Amino acid sequence: VSALAGVTLPNVHAAGSDLIRVALVGCGGRGTGAAGQALSTKSGPIKLVAMADVFPSKLKASLERLTKQYPQQVSQIDVPAERQFIGFDGYKAAMDCLKPGDVVILATPPAFRWVMFQHAIAKGLHVFMEKPVSVDGPRRAG
């Protein structure tokens, strides 16, 4: 470990631009917190550009909370109504706002994440999600 202490690693940014676009899928408390942490990073220019949730009230509350809790990052939040997606397929529309190399935050119940994860990887996106990535269905004993 000490041999690597003096090595400087380059910052990694999305191809073609220094701007890293972020989409949030799952706008509850954990997703909102993860988006806020992403916006607070000093690693590079980051912008929240799309949000998706099954419940309109969750998405609205998340957007309001982000703008109030992170006033220094308000310029990094660019999620107009046309990039706010409601419903079970909203994750696809939110990810479609991104380019390969951008980031999607998956903060949904684990039962749905594997489908979203597959879509994100197929689009060339980086993914942030917490464990468990997915859950196994119940099995019969014996």
PLM feature segments, named:
Residues 126, 133-142:
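A contiguous active-site-proximal alpha/beta segment in oxidoreductase catalytic domains
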Residues 1-125, 142:
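N-terminal glycine-/serine-/threonine-rich beta1-alpha1-beta2 phosphate-ribose binding loop
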